[in-house]
Amino acid sequence: MHYPEPISKLIDSFMKLPGIGPKTAQRLAFHTLDMKEDDVVQFAKALVDVKRELTYCSVCGHITENDPCYICEDKQRDRSVICVVEDDKDVIAMEKMREYKGLYHVLHGSISPMDGIGPEDINIPSLIERLKSDEVSELILAMNPNLEGESTAMYISRLVKPIGIKVTRLAQGLSVGGDLEYADEVTLSKAIAGRTEM
């Protein structure tokens, strides 16, 4: 179907978001057309602000307005434990349970040879550097329980073991093939409490 160019561009833009296909993008574009102009301007500004005002923490890799992030700056945190997660949504999920008091390291992905993503393509080198300089006694690997997450956890475990740091994995109360961000607080809390050494 032929749309006016501004609508076509908006549909194409919405389709760049994960999980948004042509029909949903079309619905969103026409909904945007029906919105008040002030709301559209505010929406567009929020999109631009996310890219301009946020950065990644130079210590852990988590999204932040200030570098280092509020978690790395918090002196009350247990600095002997680092929980390694795949992405920022996992940090947010872990923080919701309000039980984990250590630090984080965000990989921004997982090892996936099928997608051409190797260890050097995610935030693993900075993790190893961090472990050499910080006084860390335990590394909790909180990757998603899927093939890529398991591969990433095994790779990191093999790298870290020679350093002499205890490496643990979340308990397997999490469903295989699921994503950490969708787990409820109770499941995450039990997974942290029941973590096992690798």
Swiss-Prot record:
Keywords: DNA damage, DNA recombination, DNA repair, Metal-binding, Zinc, Zinc-finger
SUPFAM superfamilies named in the record: Recombination protein RecR (SSF111304)
Molecular-function GO terms, alphabetical: DNA binding; zinc ion binding
GO biological process per UniProt: DNA recombination; DNA repair
Mapped zinc finger ranges (C4-type): 57-72
SMART domains xrefs: HhH1, TOPRIM
Any Pfam family hit: RecR_ZnF
Every Toprim domain range: 80-175
Family classification: Belongs to the RecR family.
Role: May play a role in DNA repair. It seems to be involved in an RecBC-independent recombinational process of DNA repair. It may act with RecF and RecO.
Protein name (Swiss-Prot/TrEMBL): Recombination protein RecR
Originating species: Staphylococcus aureus (strain JH9)
Gene designation per UniProt: recR
